């Protein structure tokens, strides 16, 4: 798959990821910007 970005060596396929410790308040997009909403469908390789 073509990855939008990498976080800790893992691919982001939907353009954002969430910290498992704070899934509703600590999301980031591929630009590294903090987003204050849940990112549904986050998929890691």
Curated annotation (Swiss-Prot):
Modified residues (6'-bromotryptophan): 17, 37-38, 44
Compartments in which it is found: Secreted
Coiled coil: none
Presence of keyword Secreted: yes
S-S bonds: 3-16, 11-28, 18-33, 27-39
Primary residence: secreted
Keywords: Bromination, Disulfide bond, Gamma-carboxyglutamic acid, Hydroxylation, Ion channel impairing toxin, Neurotoxin, Secreted, Toxin
Positions where 4-hydroxyproline occurs in the chain: 23, 40
Positions bearing 4-carboxyglutamate: 21
Biological function: Mu-conotoxins block voltage-gated sodium channels. This toxin reversibly blocks voltage-gated sodium channel in cephalopods, with no alteration in the voltage dependence of sodium conductance or on the kinetics of inactivation.
Domains: entry comment: The cysteine framework is XII (C-C-C-C-CC-C-C).
Name used for this protein in its record: Mu-conotoxin-like Cal 12.1.1d
UniProt source species: Californiconus californicus (California cone)
